[in-house]
Amino acid sequence: MSNSQKQNGSIIAIITMFFLYAMIAFVTNLGAPIGVIWKSQPGIDGNNMLGMMGNFMNFFAYLFMGIPAGKMLTKIGYKKSALIGIAVGFFGVLVQFISSFPTGIAGFCVYLLGAFISGFSVCILNTVVNPMLNLLGGGGNRGNQLNLIGGTLNSLTGTLTPMLVGALIGEVTKSTQMADVNLVLYIAMAVFAGAFVALTFIPIQDPELGKVTAETKFEHSPWSFRHCTLGVIPIFVYVGVEVGIPGALNFYLSDTTEKGAGLLENAATIGGAVAAMYWLLMLCGRLVSGFIAGKVSSRQLMLATTCVGMILILAAMVLPKTSTVTMPLFSIMTFSFTSAVVPVSALLLVLCGLCTSIMWASIFNLATEGLGKYTAQASGIFMMMVVGGGVLPLIQGWFSNFMGYMPSYFVYLLAMAYMFYYALFGCKNVNKDIPVE
C-alpha cells in the first residue's frame, strides 16, 4: 500500500471514529434527563437514587463488557467491533422505546433493561474509539489531541440531548410519561441505523501501531505497569464526576419541592437547559484544548483542572440557594438564547464542564503511555471502570435523599482530589524495562 493510500485510510478512520464518539454521548446522556420522568412516577415518588437507576444500568453494563470488548478488539478488529456496538445500540434504544407502553413499575423495569443493553453498545464503541484515535495519532500529545477533538463532537451531542429531553418534558407532573420523549428515541434509532449502513461501506484499516496478531506474545499484562494500575481508579471516579455533576444538577433544578432549587415554572425545561450548558462548556473546553494539547502535557492539564474543579464544587456546596444569578441559556425549540434565574451554585457547577472536558483523554493518555501491544487490553480494563459513571451518581443520589442536593456533592469533591493525586504522583511510567513491541 502506498503512503498516500495509507494517509487517506487514516483520515477516513479518524473521521469515522469522531462520528462514533458523538454517538456515545447521545445514548449515554439520555439516562439522567429521562430519569426525571421516572422519578415522578407512582412507586418511585421522587426518590433520587431510583431516578438515577437508568443512568446506573447504562454504566453497569461496562462492568460486564469492558474486558470482553477489549478482547473483541484484538480478535476481530476495529470495524467489526464498531458494527456490533452499533447494532446492539439500536436494539437497546428500541427496548427503551417499548418501555413507554407498560405502565408503572413494569415500564420502569423494561426501561432499565433497555438502558442496560445500551450500555453494552457504548462500552464497545468507547473501546474502539479511544485506543484507535490514540494509535492513529502515534501516541503522546498527538494521540491526546485527536481524542480531545473527537471529544468536541461528543460534547456537542451531549449538550443537545438533555436540552431536547427537557424541552419535550416542560414541567414534570405525575402525568408525564416516557412517551413524551419518543422523538429523542426515534432520532437515536435513526442515527444507529444510518451509522451501521455507512460504516459497512467505509474501508477502515486497523492501525499498524499496537496491532496484535496470532503470533503476538504477551509476557506481561497492563497490570504490570504501575501507572496503568493506578490509572484505573481515576477513570472510575472521573466518569462519575463527568456524568454526576450535570445529572444531579438537572434533578435539583427540576425538583419543585422544598428540596429543589426553588424554580416554579418550566423547572424541567430549565434544568435540562442548564445541564446542557455544562456539556456545552465541555465542548468548548475540548475544542480549545484540542489545539493546545500538543504544547501542554496531559499531566499539566490534569493538575490545573482538578484544582479549579475542587474550588468550584466546594463553593457550590456552601452557597445558599437564595444567592441567585441570571444565567444565559439556549432554547432548542426556538433556536435562540434566553435566560433564567438560578442559584449561583448551579452556575459554578456548570463551569466544572470546562474542567472535566480534558480529563478523560488526559487520564487515558497518561495511563496508557508506553504500553504498546498492551494498549487494547488496558482499554478493556478502563472500560470496566466506566461503571463509575453509574456508581458515583447513585451514591450521591442516596446521600441527597436525606442530606440535600448540594451537600451531597462532597462525593465529587473527593473524586477530584484523587484525580489530582494521580496527576501529581501516580502517572509516572516506572516500568520502562518491560518490552512492549
List where the protein language model places each region.
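C-terminal ends and interior cores of transmembrane alpha-helices
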Residues: 87-105, 308-338
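Helix-loop-helix hairpin linking two adjacent transmembrane segments in secondary transporters
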Residues: 143-203
